[in-house]
Amino acid sequence: SLEELNDIDKCLSYHQTLDCHYTALGGFHSDRTEDWSQFAKDFTDVARKLADGGLHVGYHNHSHEWALLDTSRPINILTEQCGPEVYFEIDTYWVAHAGADPSAWINVIAALGPGRIPSVHLKDIQISAERQQKMSEVGAGNLNWPAILAACRNASVQWYLVERDAGDLDPFESLKISLENLRAMGLE
Protein backbone atom coordinates (compact mmCIF):
# COMPACT_ATOMS: atom_id res chain seq x y z
CA SER A 1 0.00 0.00 0.00
CA LEU A 2 1.02 3.62 -0.35
CA GLU A 3 1.05 3.87 3.43
CA GLU A 4 3.56 1.00 3.67
CA LEU A 5 5.76 2.55 0.99
CA ASN A 6 5.56 5.86 2.83
CA ASP A 7 7.34 4.29 5.83
CA ILE A 8 10.56 5.08 3.98
CA ASP A 9 13.11 3.65 6.42
CA LYS A 10 11.19 0.41 6.99
CA CYS A 11 10.51 -0.02 3.27
CA LEU A 12 14.15 0.57 2.30
CA SER A 13 15.42 -1.74 5.04
CA TYR A 14 13.07 -4.53 3.97
CA HIS A 15 14.01 -4.30 0.30
CA GLN A 16 17.73 -3.96 1.08
CA THR A 17 17.53 -7.15 3.15
CA LEU A 18 16.16 -8.91 0.07
CA ASP A 19 18.69 -7.17 -2.22
CA CYS A 20 15.65 -6.02 -4.17
CA HIS A 21 15.88 -2.76 -6.11
CA TYR A 22 12.37 -2.71 -7.61
CA THR A 23 8.91 -2.85 -6.08
CA ALA A 24 5.48 -2.13 -7.48
CA LEU A 25 2.20 -1.09 -5.95
CA GLY A 26 -0.61 -3.36 -7.09
CA GLY A 27 -3.33 -0.81 -7.50
CA PHE A 28 -5.28 2.10 -6.14
CA HIS A 29 -9.07 2.39 -6.19
CA SER A 30 -11.34 5.39 -6.45
CA ASP A 31 -14.15 6.53 -8.72
CA ARG A 32 -13.09 10.19 -8.49
CA THR A 33 -10.54 11.82 -10.79
CA GLU A 34 -9.47 14.15 -7.97
CA ASP A 35 -8.44 11.15 -5.87
CA TRP A 36 -6.40 9.72 -8.74
CA SER A 37 -4.65 13.06 -9.25
CA GLN A 38 -3.83 13.27 -5.56
CA PHE A 39 -2.64 9.67 -5.60
CA ALA A 40 -0.34 10.40 -8.59
CA LYS A 41 1.19 13.32 -6.69
CA ASP A 42 1.58 11.39 -3.42
CA PHE A 43 2.89 8.30 -5.20
CA THR A 44 5.49 10.35 -7.07
CA ASP A 45 6.61 11.98 -3.81
CA VAL A 46 7.07 8.58 -2.14
CA ALA A 47 8.78 7.15 -5.23
CA ARG A 48 11.22 10.08 -5.23
CA LYS A 49 12.14 9.48 -1.58
CA LEU A 50 12.58 5.75 -2.12
CA ALA A 51 14.64 6.34 -5.29
CA ASP A 52 17.03 8.41 -3.18
CA GLY A 53 17.55 5.22 -1.16
CA GLY A 54 18.08 3.06 -4.24
CA LEU A 55 14.59 1.58 -4.59
CA HIS A 56 12.64 2.00 -7.83
CA VAL A 57 8.87 2.16 -7.37
CA GLY A 58 6.28 1.25 -9.97
CA TYR A 59 2.56 0.95 -10.49
CA HIS A 60 1.09 -2.43 -11.49
CA ASN A 61 -2.21 -2.10 -13.34
CA HIS A 62 -5.42 -4.06 -13.27
CA SER A 63 -8.46 -3.38 -15.48
CA HIS A 64 -10.14 -0.64 -13.44
CA GLU A 65 -7.52 1.93 -14.47
CA TRP A 66 -9.24 2.05 -17.90
CA ALA A 67 -12.68 2.90 -16.48
CA LEU A 68 -14.01 6.26 -17.63
CA LEU A 69 -14.42 8.60 -14.65
CA ASP A 70 -15.94 12.01 -15.21
CA THR A 71 -13.74 13.16 -18.08
CA SER A 72 -10.67 10.94 -17.84
CA ARG A 73 -9.41 7.42 -17.19
CA PRO A 74 -7.16 6.63 -14.21
CA ILE A 75 -4.46 5.24 -16.51
CA ASN A 76 -4.31 8.58 -18.34
CA ILE A 77 -4.10 10.47 -15.06
CA LEU A 78 -1.26 8.22 -13.87
CA THR A 79 0.75 8.39 -17.08
CA GLU A 80 0.29 12.16 -17.35
CA GLN A 81 0.80 13.07 -13.69
CA CYS A 82 3.22 10.56 -12.15
CA GLY A 83 6.78 11.81 -12.31
CA PRO A 84 9.70 9.99 -13.93
CA GLU A 85 10.51 8.36 -10.57
CA VAL A 86 7.48 6.09 -11.10
CA TYR A 87 7.78 3.18 -13.50
CA PHE A 88 4.83 1.21 -14.85
CA GLU A 89 4.49 -2.55 -14.74
CA ILE A 90 1.96 -3.40 -17.45
CA ASP A 91 -0.05 -6.58 -16.91
CA THR A 92 -1.09 -7.82 -20.35
CA TYR A 93 -4.14 -9.77 -19.14
CA TRP A 94 -5.66 -6.88 -17.22
CA VAL A 95 -5.08 -4.41 -20.06
CA ALA A 96 -6.91 -6.76 -22.44
CA HIS A 97 -9.59 -7.44 -19.81
CA ALA A 98 -10.27 -3.69 -19.84
CA GLY A 99 -10.70 -3.78 -23.62
CA ALA A 100 -7.40 -2.06 -24.38
CA ASP A 101 -4.42 -3.20 -26.44
CA PRO A 102 -1.41 -4.29 -24.34
CA SER A 103 1.14 -3.57 -27.07
CA ALA A 104 -0.26 -0.07 -27.58
CA TRP A 105 -0.02 0.64 -23.85
CA ILE A 106 3.52 -0.69 -23.65
CA ASN A 107 4.35 1.80 -26.41
CA VAL A 108 2.54 4.63 -24.57
CA ILE A 109 4.51 3.96 -21.39
CA ALA A 110 7.81 3.60 -23.27
CA ALA A 111 7.22 7.00 -24.89
CA LEU A 112 7.25 8.58 -21.41
CA GLY A 113 11.01 8.11 -21.31
CA PRO A 114 13.79 5.65 -20.50
CA GLY A 115 13.27 3.30 -17.58
CA ARG A 116 9.52 3.79 -17.37
CA ILE A 117 8.70 0.15 -18.19
CA PRO A 118 11.44 -2.19 -16.93
CA SER A 119 9.09 -5.15 -16.43
CA VAL A 120 5.91 -6.57 -17.91
CA HIS A 121 3.59 -9.21 -16.48
CA LEU A 122 2.84 -11.67 -19.25
CA LYS A 123 -0.56 -13.31 -18.95
CA ASP A 124 -2.94 -14.37 -21.69
CA ILE A 125 -6.71 -14.02 -21.87
CA GLN A 126 -8.90 -16.69 -23.38
CA ILE A 127 -12.49 -16.25 -24.47
CA SER A 128 -14.58 -19.38 -23.96
CA ALA A 129 -17.40 -20.58 -26.21
CA GLU A 130 -19.72 -19.24 -23.49
CA ARG A 131 -18.14 -15.78 -24.02
CA GLN A 132 -16.40 -15.85 -20.65
CA GLN A 133 -12.95 -14.35 -20.14
CA LYS A 134 -10.37 -16.38 -18.27
CA MET A 135 -6.63 -16.41 -17.81
CA SER A 136 -4.65 -18.86 -19.86
CA GLU A 137 -1.08 -19.80 -20.56
CA VAL A 138 0.88 -17.30 -22.63
CA GLY A 139 0.26 -18.13 -26.28
CA ALA A 140 -2.85 -20.22 -25.57
CA GLY A 141 -5.28 -17.33 -25.54
CA ASN A 142 -6.36 -14.41 -27.67
CA LEU A 143 -3.57 -11.86 -27.21
CA ASN A 144 -1.36 -10.73 -30.09
CA TRP A 145 1.98 -11.94 -28.72
CA PRO A 146 4.13 -10.94 -31.71
CA ALA A 147 2.95 -7.32 -31.26
CA ILE A 148 3.32 -7.45 -27.46
CA LEU A 149 6.84 -8.89 -27.59
CA ALA A 150 7.89 -6.42 -30.30
CA ALA A 151 6.62 -3.55 -28.13
CA CYS A 152 8.53 -4.97 -25.15
CA ARG A 153 11.74 -5.18 -27.17
CA ASN A 154 11.27 -1.64 -28.49
CA ALA A 155 10.65 -0.44 -24.92
CA SER A 156 13.84 -2.17 -23.68
CA VAL A 157 11.87 -4.21 -21.14
CA GLN A 158 14.35 -5.99 -18.87
CA TRP A 159 12.10 -8.50 -17.09
CA TYR A 160 9.37 -10.60 -18.64
CA LEU A 161 7.37 -11.93 -15.70
CA VAL A 162 5.13 -14.89 -16.49
CA GLU A 163 2.27 -14.88 -14.05
CA ARG A 164 -0.86 -16.95 -13.60
CA ASP A 165 -3.35 -15.81 -10.95
CA ALA A 166 -5.78 -18.71 -11.37
CA GLY A 167 -6.24 -21.68 -13.64
CA ASP A 168 -7.18 -25.29 -14.17
CA LEU A 169 -3.63 -26.58 -14.48
CA ASP A 170 -0.95 -27.16 -11.89
CA PRO A 171 0.90 -23.81 -11.60
CA PHE A 172 4.23 -25.36 -12.61
CA GLU A 173 2.70 -27.04 -15.66
CA SER A 174 1.09 -23.72 -16.58
CA LEU A 175 4.45 -21.95 -16.25
CA LYS A 176 6.16 -24.63 -18.35
CA ILE A 177 3.62 -24.21 -21.17
CA SER A 178 3.95 -20.42 -21.09
CA LEU A 179 7.75 -20.60 -21.20
CA GLU A 180 7.72 -23.12 -24.04
CA ASN A 181 5.32 -20.90 -26.00
CA LEU A 182 7.44 -17.80 -25.37
CA ARG A 183 10.58 -19.62 -26.51
CA ALA A 184 8.75 -20.76 -29.65
CA MET A 185 7.97 -17.07 -30.27
CA GLY A 186 11.70 -16.26 -30.04
CA LEU A 187 11.94 -14.98 -26.47
CA GLU A 188 14.95 -16.31 -24.59
Predicted regions span which residues?
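C-terminal helical cap(s) of enzyme catalytic domains, especially alpha/beta-barrels
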Residues: 169-188
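Flexible loop residues that form catalytic
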Residues: 28, 125, 165
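A short, acidic, flexible beta-alpha connecting loop/helix-capping segment that sits on the rim
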Residues: 161-171
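Non-catalytic positions within long, well-ordered alpha-helices that form the structural scaffold/packing
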Residues: 16, 110-113, 153
